[in-house]
Amino acid sequence: MEPTPMLRDRDHDDAPPTYEQAMGLCPTTVSTPPPPPPDCSPPPYRPPYCLVSSPSPRHTFDMDMMEMPATMHPTTGAYFDNGWKWTFALLVVAILGIIFLAVVFTVVINRDSANITTGTQASSG
């Protein structure tokens, strides 16, 4: 009967795999291939792999833009046609916000100064 792995003697344990074995690498030797015979035909042409495979979804827009002729690309200003509307709206909201804050601070300061003046007049009279 085979002893359980926990009870086996450490001397009989298998050695851990080497780095090459663990990574699935085999030792390779670098050597130049022999020159082809003079009557040998060249290998058949294979297109590059990037043209054979389909592009990933995130590059689809770039690919579509590349397929269009340069004269048909939208101008840079076309991407910002609605930008001036948002800029104007933001400017109006910012100005209204500044006016609102100025009115609120003015009312609060005037209310505090009115309470102080009425309080001093009431105590002296």
Curated annotation (Swiss-Prot):
What is the annotated quaternary arrangement, including any partners? Interacts with host ITCH; this interaction induces the ubiquitination and subsequent degradation of ITCH. Interacts with host STING1. Interacts with CGAS.
Q: What is the lineage of its organism?
A: Viruses, Duplodnaviria, Heunggongvirae, Peploviricota, Herviviricetes
Which Gene Ontology CC terms are recorded? host cell cytoplasm; host cell membrane; membrane
Protein name, as recorded: Protein UL42
Short sequence motif PPXY motif: positions: 16-19, 42-45
Similarity remark: Belongs to the Cytomegalovirus UL42 protein family.
Instruction: Name a Pfam family for this protein.
Output: UL42
Composition-biased stretches (Pro residues):
32-47
Q: Where is this region: Disordered?
A: 1-47
What is written about domains in the entry's comments?
A: Late-budding domains (L domains) are short sequence motifs essential for viral particle budding. They recruit proteins of the host ESCRT machinery (Endosomal Sorting Complex Required for Transport) or ESCRT-associated proteins. Contains one L domain: a PPXY motif which is involved in the interaction with ITCH, a member of the NEDD4 family.
- UniProt xrefs under InterPro entries: UL42
Q: Write out the function statement from the record.
A: Plays a role in the inhibition of host innate immune response to promote latent infection. Mechanistically, suppresses viral DNA-triggered signaling by impairing DNA binding and oligomerization of CGAS. Also impairs the translocation of host STING1 from the endoplasmic reticulum to perinuclear punctate structures which is an essential step for its activation. Regulates the function of host NEDD4 family ubiquitin E3 ligases through its PPxY motif and thereby prevents the excessive ubiquitination of gB and its degradation by inhibiting these E3 ligases.
Q: Spell out where the chain crosses the membrane.
A: 89-109
Membrane topology term reads: Single-pass membrane protein
Alphabetical GO biological process terms: symbiont-mediated suppression of host innate immune response
List localization entries.
Host membrane; Host cytoplasm
Record keywords, A-Z: Host cytoplasm, Host membrane, Host-virus interaction, Inhibition of host innate immune response by virus, Membrane, Transmembrane, Transmembrane helix, Viral immunoevasion
